[in-house]
Amino acid sequence: MHPSAMRNCKSFFEVYASKMEGGTVLDIGSQDVNGSLREVTPKQFKYVGVDFEKAKNVDVVLDSPYIFPFADEAADILITSSCLEHSEFFWLTWLEMLRVVKPTGLIYVNVPSEGQYHAYPVDCWRFKLNAGHALQKWGKRAGFNPLLLEAYTDAEPPWHDSVAVFVKEWDNHSLYPDRINTDEL
């Protein structure tokens, strides 16, 4: 995990989860490659690392990256960093993320907007600032009601992380008044 990805996720937890008493955090794409988001997940949360191969920091191995072995609304928070660029059909993964998060739950997405090719096992995508809006629209089209709380592009090279934070149900946005980045969407 590159340093800016760790820093951005740590900021997410500090801003959005600091007042939460605990719950379950699912980390999609959790394999420890030079670090893991487990390191920045607050101790009051039960962290579950999820990936499609058995490796360091993987608690649950997926049979398919597009079908998660969790009940509907099982997680309080879902995080994914440096993962969706490796998903050939990230829009299917996105819908599974929405399915497994509680209505008051949060989804944190971090995908490079730039950077060199890095296949694990493939490298298909880069996200730009408007990717969060597109994910919100795709979720609504599929029958969910997510709200993009914030989106920004990190200035640190070489990845210039594209970060987006969502609440699963639009009606619950008032639970999360604070933001990592105070710039407007």
Predicted regions, residues:
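Generic anion/oxyanion-binding catalytic loop in active/binding sites
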Residues: 64, 79-82, 121
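Beta-hairpin (beta-strand-turn-beta-strand) motif
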Residues: 63, 83, 112-114
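Redox-cofactor binding/interface segments in oxidoreductases and associated redox assembly factors
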Residues: 27, 80, 109
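Charge-dense, low-complexity intrinsically disordered segments
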Residues: 3, 84, 126
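Conserved N-terminal segment of class I S-adenosyl-L-methionine
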Residues: 1-73, 77, 163, 174-185
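A short SAM/SAH-binding and catalytic strip from SAM-dependent methyltransferases
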Residues: 76-88
